[in-house]
Each structure stands twice: as C-alpha cells, then as structure tokens.
C-alpha cells in the first residue's frame, strides 16, 4: 500500500507577529484557535502563499478594501509582513519518504503601491534533524537572531553535503516540481490551472458553496478526455494532413512540370549569369594581367623611346649646335669668300693703281725735271729781265738826269741832290754811315770787289746748287722711298734703314716666292686635317654607337669581328624565321587542338555530370564502360530482391494496421458488430466495463474471462432470447453475461489463481485453464499499450516499407538513368579529360607564346645587333682608310706651322707687292743716302743768301758807283760843264737805253714765254701731283681697306675659300639633312612617345579600372561564393559546360530564362519581387538570392514529410519516385482514417457513460456525509437535450447529412459544427468559427450538465444553493464537493505522475466555529477516510480531543507585538502531552 504524502510543518519567518514560528501539522486536522486578530488568517495566508506564490491570484479578502480590484491595491499580503526578508516554508514528506521543503521568500517593496516581491524556492535532501527555522535564521545571542537573505541561504545550503537548493524564476517550474514530488494533486501547466487550484483553495478557506466552482464543476470534476480528444484531433489532423498531402501531391503533380520548368529556368538564369561572371572574372583577370603585361611592355617601350628621344634630342642638340657653328662657319666662309673676292678686286685695283702711280711717278719725275729746268730758265730770264729792267731804269734815270741838267739850270742842284741821295742810299745800302764822296771810290772798289766775290761765290754756289740739286733730288727720292717703305725716320738713319730694307726685301722676295708652294702645301694639309677631323668624328660616333671607346689599333680586329658577327647574325636571322615559322605552326596546331577539345569538353562534362550523378546515386566509382554494364545487371537483381522484401513488409504492415484498427474500436470491441449488438440488446460490452482495468491487472482478467472477454453484459438474458432468433450478423461465438453493468464484478466464476495462470471452474465438470497472455489486450490500458507497441512496429514497418518502396523506385529510376547514360554518354564518358588536356595544351601554348615572345625579342635584338654591326662595318669601312690620318698626331701642328709660314710668306708677298717697286727704285740710288749733300735746303738758302748778297753787293756797288759817279756833283755847282763834257755820254746813254730797252723787251718776252711755259709745266706737274696724290691716297685707302679686310688675296685664296665654303655647305647640308631626319625621327619619336603615353595612361586607366573592377568583382564574387557555399547551391550553379559558352550566349541564355521566369513567377509576389531585384546587373548576389528564394519556395511547396531531402531538385526526383506510391498509400490511409459519424457518437456516448459511472462511484463516497439537516450529497450528471439530439442524428440519421461529412473542403469538426447549427438554428454561435465549435462538440464534457444536490430533511433531493442551506450546511456541502474535486484530480493525474507517488491532500476551513459538533465530527471522519489533512481556524477550541490544536494569543511586550502559540495533541487515554517545540517557540518572537 502506497503511503500518501503529508505536510509536516509550516514555518513563518518575520511575518507580522511571527518572527520564527514553525507549526507542526497533524496528519488529519490541525486547528488554529484564537480570538480576533490572533493570527489565524495570517498563518493560513502564509500557507496559501507558499502553495500558490502568484500575486495575480492571491487575495485575502478579510483584510482587503471591499470591492477593490486594482492590481496596485494591497491584496492583504503586504500588511501581514514585517520589514525586511520574510519566508513562508512548507516541510513535506512524500510517498517515497523524501523530505522536501518548499517555500517563498517575501519582501515588501518600498512605495505607495504596497507591493510584495516573491521568490519561490525548494530544498531537497535536508536531514530530518535540521529544523526550517535553523536554515533561515542566524542566532546572534541568547535574545537576538537575524534572518538570512536568499543568497545567504543558498550559500549556507551549498555548504551542506547532499542538500539541493533550487530557486525558480517561474511559478510553472515551481508547481511542476511540486507535482512531480507529490506535493500538489494536479499539474498546473498554465495560469488557468493555477487559477482553478487557487479558487479551490479559496473556496475551501472561506467555506460555503463556491459559485465559481459549482458553475464550472465540469472543468473541476470531469477529466479532459485528452486521449480521445487527441485521438480525434490527431485523426482529424491526419485526415486533414492526408488530404492536404494528397492535394499537395495532386498540386505537385500538376505543378511538377512548372517546378521543373522553374528550377530549370532559374538554374539557367542564375547559372548562366553565375558562369558568365565566373568567365568574366577569369577574362577580367586575364585582361588585367594582359593590361599589366602590356603596361609594363609599354613602360619599357616608353623608357626605350625616352632614351632614344634623349639620344636623338642630344644628337639633335649637337646638330643644332653644329648647325649654328656650321652656319656661322659657312657664313664666315661665304663672307671670307666674299672678302677674298673683294680683296682680289681690291688687289687688282691696288695693282692697277700702283701701276698708274708708277707711271704717274715717272711722268711726275720727268715733269718735275722739266719744271725744274723751266724754273731755272725762268729764274735766268727773270734775272736777265730784271737786270735789263734795272739797266733800262738806270739808263733812263741817267738819261733823265742828264737831260734834266741839260734842260734846267738847276740840274746841278738836282744832281747835287741826286748825289746826296745817292750818297745816302749808298750809306744805307752799304751800311757806311761814314761814307763820303771821297771815300766812295775806295769803298766802291771794296764793294766792287765784294760784288765780284759775291758774284763768284754765287756762281760757285750756283754750280754747287746745280750739282746738289741733282744729288738732292736723288737723295730726296731715295729718302722718300725709304720713308714710304719704313715710315717717318731721321734723315741720318736713312742709309741704315735703306740697307735693312733692301736686305729685308731680298728675304721678303724669297718668302713671297714660297707663297704658292706653301699655299698648296697648306691646302693639302688642311684637306688632310679636315679628313682627320672627319675621321675623328666618325670614330667618336662609332664609339658612341658601339657604347665603348676603341683604340685605333683595335679597329681592324673589330672590323673582322663585326664581319664575323654579321655573318653569324645573318645565319641566326635566317634560321630564326624558320624557327618562328615552326613555333607558329605548332601554336596554330595547339590552337586548333584546343578548339576541338573545347568543342568536345561540354559533351564530356555532360557525360561526367551524368556519370557523377550515377556514382552519387549508387555510391560506386566507375572507371570503364564494362563496370557500368556489370553494375546495371547487379541493379536489376537488387531491384527484384527489393520488390520481394517490400511486398513482405507491406503485407506485415497491413496486418498491423488491421490489428490496430481492431484494437482501436470503442469499448475494446474487436468486432464492430459487437457494438451494434450491445446497443440492440441494451447491454454493455464486458471489455467496456473493464475498460479502466490497470495494465498490471489486464493479464489476469484477460485470462479470467478467456474467450468471453468480448461478451455483452445484459441486465436480463430472458429479455433478449427472442432477439437471438434469426441473428446472423454476429461473430461465430457470441457470449452473453447477465449482470448489472453499473455494479458488475467477477463473482460469476469460481477461479483459482496459479503462477501466471488461472483455472476457471465454469461448471462442475468443465474447467478452463488460461495462462496470462504475454500481450494482454483486455482493458483500455492494455489495448493502448498494445496499440502503442503496434504503432511503434507500424512506424518501423511503414518506414521500412517507405524505404523499400523508395529504394525500388530509386532502383528503377537508377536503372532508367543507367539506360539513358548508356545510350547517350557511354561512348565519351570514359575518354580522357579534355579540360586537363586543354590545361596542358594551354600551358604549352603559354610556353609557346613565351617562347615566341622571347624569340621575337631575341630576333629583334639580333636584328638590332645585325643593323648595329652593319652600321659599325660601314663606319669602319669609312674609318679604316683614314687610320693613318687618325694616327698622325702632328698634322695639326704642321698645319699651324705651314699656316704661320704662309702667313709670313703672304705678309712678305704683300710687302713685296706693296714696296717692291720702291725697293727696286731704292736699290740703285741707295748709295746717295750715305751722306746728305750739305743739306740741300741749307744750300738753297745759302744760294739764295749768296744771291741776295750778290744782289746787295751789286746794288751797293751800283750805289757806290753812282756816288762815285756823282762825286763830281758834290763839287760842281752847275751842270754846264757836265752837260758839255758829256754830250757823247747822252748819245751813248741813249744807245745803251735803246739796247737796254730792246734787251728788256726781249727778256720780258722770253720771261713771259718761259713764264707761260713754266706755268704750263707747273700746271702739268700740279695735275700730275694731284693725280699722284689722289691715286696715292686711293691706293692707301685701298691698302687700308685690304688690310681691314684681313685676308690674303693671292691667286689660290678664292679657290680655297670657295672650296672651304662648298665643303661647309656640304657639311651644313648634311647636318641639316641629318637634323631634318632627326627632327622627323624626333617628331615621330615624340608622337610615338605621346601615343605611348596616351596608351600608357589609357592602359593605366584601363588596368586600374580593370583591377578595381576585379577587386570589386572579387568582393562581390566572394559575397556570391559565400552565399553560394552557405546555401549549398554551388553544385547546381557551377556548370562547367557553360564555361565554354561566350558571354553573349550566356547572356542570351540568361535573358531567355528570365523571360520564362517572369511568366513562371507572375503569380508569386515574393518571387516576382526577388526576381525583379535580381535583374540588377551590378548585384549578381541578388540572382543567388533569387535562386535560394526559388529553392526555399520549392522547399516550402514540397512536403518535407514525404521527401527525405532538402534539395528541391532531389526532392522532385524523389517525389517522382514517391508520387504514385504515396498517392495510393494516402488514399488507402484516408479510407482507414475516415471517421464515421456513428463511431464518433458511440465514442462520445461511451465516454459519457464512463464518466457517469465514475460520478456515481464518487456519489457513493458522499452518501454518508451529513451536515445539519443535510443527510446526503450527490452530483447529478445529465446530457443536454441539444447535444443528445446531435448524438441521435449522428447515430441514426447520418445519411441525411452526408453532404457535410463527405465534403473534402470541410474537416470533421467543421462538418460537426455545421450539423449542430443546422439542428439548432435558434442558438447564436457568436464569433466562434466552425472549427472551434466542432472541437468543442468533440469534447464530451460539453454534452453534460452537472449540479450538486443535497438530501435535506423533508425537502428531499434539491439543488444545493447557499440560499437554501444554513451556513454550516453550506460549508459542509462545499467541503464535500472540494473533496470530490481533489479525488477527481488525483485520479486524472495518476497517469501523468509516477505510480509510486500518492499526493498530499490538504484543505482549509476558516471560521469553522459555524459548524456544529456533528458536522465537525463528520469532517474529521471524512479526513480520516480520505487520508486528507485539514487546517481549520476558529475563535475557540472546537474539537480538542482530535487532531492537533494550536492556541494563538497576540500579545504586546515592550512595544513589540508577537503571537503566543500553544499546541496540544488530541485527547487520548493517556494524559495529553504538549507537542514538541511548543514551549520555547515563542522565544524568538518575543525576543524580536
């Protein structure tokens, strides 16, 4: 016998009046007595709070504001607590003898809302010796203690070995533990269950008949037939699911092509774009690499062009500089030629003028001599004319004087005066102041002698003059020549200078004779020098082009080396073309081979995909076509074996289904006809009577009744005898047993129970031995157990059958796949991998391209070397003949030397040309320069002075002679003597005068003629002199101009200048031609550089754009790949055969698929939106999202309970395998699961009958309950009329309403609701749906009406209402009802809890003083009979002789309020003893 769990004690910590109080609870009744305010309600409130710690339910009305419903109001709990931590704990012992302490920690929350914080907890494994108060309090001293917090309590319990502490965050977990450990009678899963439990406790606490419970007695008393309801729901759900599955299959069958089309088009749409992006990414990578290679190549080309540009710019600069210098040189040469030509013309002029000057010089000299002679003759004529004139004048004067003396008497005076005048003139002329007429004669002789002397001297001087004049003219001429040649010099230096000039002239003539040879030599040397300079320039250019400096001695060896290199390079170039041709031919062959393989690769890939699918499906690896055909044979054999096994499993499954169907019949009837016969006979199946038999008793009763376990129990066998006549629709053996179905027992047999068997004595001579069946099916529990095992077996069989069917279908499809593979791909599937060959060939192609590039580079380099070698040889060919010139290091010095000698010779030639004539003239007369002939000028002056002296002497002599002649005049006083004495004189004077006049005339005529002639001669001389001077001046000017020109005007100068100019012109033309070539090349190079720069910028831009595109695409591609791998669709999207299609073909493929997809998803808003978003070409990941969305959509559309994969493609493939099988199976399953209205009515009726029987059993326990005038209490259960009509229609008239139950659009619940509305149109169903109403109609509790009736005095049975009963009667009646509810809960929960646990039973009763002693005794008896604990409260002791009584007295001590408690056990024969712990229990409270 399982002991019932009990509450041991209630502990209050820090409650109002109770600091640390533990109430030991009696096993039956615990009474709390005391006056008002003693703490009875507080104690019960603490118990209820620990039992149901739900603040939404707790409501202690006796201390709460009346009518208050607000959640913020005090529900009566806040005022019962004291400040700080409070506890309420229940100490229990369950049926397993486990001590469990459950309780709550309470604490007031500060604020005006007066709220309380509650934390439930549980303690397991606590030793019996530990009191609850010891756990939550800490003793400080003898009079003080402290309450521990929950955390401290946890820490304290953690230190205790074997003690478990649990704190709960939800009330559901708290109540679940209490239910599992047997503390409460019902599992409180929800707030509704807690509310029912609280209403039960509340009704018990406050007593009376609770309207909240009586109105809903069905919920409290009638257990929810969850099994039946769940069976109905499962069956209906299975049917609904079956129908939905069938409909889904039909829809899937109809949409299968659409799904295939959707998957195919979505795969084409996304895979084409996926592979296009993959191809484009590879192409972009290749393009980026190509761009980078081309970029590097262009950079190298640009660098080479820049170097070339720099070289050409430098060379152009050199040529520009050289052109400037050449232009200057050419201009200088042209100017020099012009100057030479000008100088030549000047020289011709000079020579012409020099010839003219020489001729003029000769003529001038000749004319000068003529003029000199004419001048001498003129002087002589002048002297002769003057002398004649003087003689005429003297004679005229003499004659005049004489005539005057003769004519006039005064002639003496005149003569005397004339004598005096003559004396005076003589004195004056002779400078003789002492001259007298007497001394005149003496002086006359003297002066005549002097005159004679002067005349002789004059004649001598005239002779010298004549001689000196000739010498002087020669000297002057020689001196003038010397001065003209040498320049101004002293006359004394003329001889020395003339000799030097003559010696120098000889040297200069010698040098001048060397001008032409020197000039020819210089021209030759200059030509060689120019050739040497040209050779040096060529050598410098050659070294510059070769990039190395070479010695002259190395050039011949280098020439031979270059010729050898040219020969080898020409051979290499000629062989390179053949090698290049071979490489290109191999490259073309590789390209054609690659094209062929690329055309074959998609076919091979399709074959490989098919082969891989076959390998995945069969799990085998195939390496040859023979293995494929062998495996196909194995597949056929496996298919035959699987079909055989499937049929066997199907047969066994059908048998199990039939057995399950048989065991699932209502009431346990294995034959449907038994139910009809039981209704016909008005009896009950024996199996239905024993439907509640436990699983342990099922074998016994099954063996007890044996074959009659399917008998029908009827009240009277005699009444059905007539009905047995003609009975055909029945089992072969029909057992009928007479008995009361309501009180049937097994006393009809005499039974002896053996070990696992019974012996039934049917009659004196007939016994039946029956062993306990190993699988009993008698009783609902046994049937359910068997059905459960059968269901498990059926599940295994169904799974096995499904697996085998699937395997068969799979094998058949695999066979078809193998057949298709053999027909389509077997010929190519096992060939070599074309992609590997393509990769190998591509590698070889890359090697060939690299080799071609290297070959082109080498060939280009060889060509460049060949050209360089040819240029080098050409340059050397020009250089080698000039090696002697290059080796001649003294050539420039010799040119300078010859140039200097030529300059000297030309200078000498110019000197000779200029002064040769003067030197030639000077040479014969150089001797005259040895001495200056007395200085001819001085001689001329002496001659003039002597001439003057002779003239003066003549005049003096004449004057003296006149004085002497007139000496008589001084003594004569008259002239008569003179006239007479000189008459002859007059005549002589006249003759002489005539002669003198004639001489004078002749002299004058000669003088005039000579003067004219002299004038003419002088004019000719002057003109000659003027012409000479002019030409001399012009000559000097020309010579100065020639000197200013500064060139040598020789005969070869013009030719050399012209040759030099022509050479410079040729060099300038060549330089300009080269410069133009360089400019063109430079322009072309600059254009090439600009093109390369633009190309480089474009390449850099394209490369950066491509690289950025690659990087961006890589990020997007990584996101796409991540999305693809995360969603596992890479295998679907990475279709290698698409890699061989072009981007346009893939784009066309994707566009075609897009058009098809738009039509396919036109009715699906989500897929349509995702497809529209996926059309963005910049967001390829959205296409993956669309593909995933399509797959997700297909996963949602395809039943996952039918298909064993998440891959829609595989699901469709599997579904094609399963469709026909599932359709047939689900159709048969629907037929099996179909619910008949009659069976539903029977199930509901049987359930109602069973519950009615259970209520009758409960009523038997209440028959002896009496309170006051109430003699008995019972529950009356009736079926509602509307629902009874519904059951009748379901049983008898279901054919009239088959339109509802045969409709595929309505579930059975909905059809049941429609039928109920059709039968009861007057009832308003409100807003409830037919499904909800139908589910309510499937719950048998809604068919019943329950009410409590009491048998009160003379009134008999009447409905229990508070108004018709006294307070005590109502309390007793209500307590009886609550006991029934608790017992009902235990029966209902027995299947949910362990079989070894009997839960605690405890109720409350406050204000129990309203019951009389008889009613109290009845309560005590009821508690004893039902093993129930009861806590009652009353102002006074109502029954101290039974149970445990606590006397509570509230006291105030030193301003501290506490409750004094005294506990007494019930009276017994021995003296009553005080309960342990009650003497000192107030100490903590008082201490507080």
Swiss-Prot record:
In residue numbers, the region (Disordered) covers: 1049-1074
| Keyword Iron assigned | no
Q: Which Pfam families match?
A: MukB, MukB_hinge, SbcC_Walker_B
Report the GO terms under cellular component.
cytoplasm; nucleoid
Q: What does this protein do?
A: Plays a central role in chromosome condensation, segregation and cell cycle progression. Functions as a homodimer, which is essential for chromosome partition. Involved in negative DNA supercoiling in vivo, and by this means organize and compact chromosomes. May achieve or facilitate chromosome segregation by condensation DNA from both sides of a centrally located replisome during cell division.
- Organism source for this protein? Salmonella typhi
A GO BP annotation: DNA replication
* Subunit organization: Homodimerization via its hinge domain. Binds to DNA via its C-terminal region. Interacts, and probably forms a ternary complex, with MukE and MukF via its C-terminal region. The complex formation is stimulated by calcium or magnesium. Interacts with tubulin-related protein FtsZ.
Subcellular localization is given as: Cytoplasm, Nucleoid
- Record note on domains: The hinge domain, which separates the large intramolecular coiled coil regions, allows the homodimerization, forming a V-shaped homodimer.
| Binding residue positions for ATP | 34-41
Classification from the root reads: Bacteria, Pseudomonadati, Pseudomonadota, Gammaproteobacteria, Enterobacterales
Q: Which family does it belong to?
A: Belongs to the SMC family. MukB subfamily.
Biased composition, class Basic and acidic residues, residue ranges: 1051-1065
Coiled coil feature spans: 326-418, 444-472, 509-602, 835-923, 977-1116, 1209-1265
What is this protein called in UniProt? Chromosome partition protein MukB
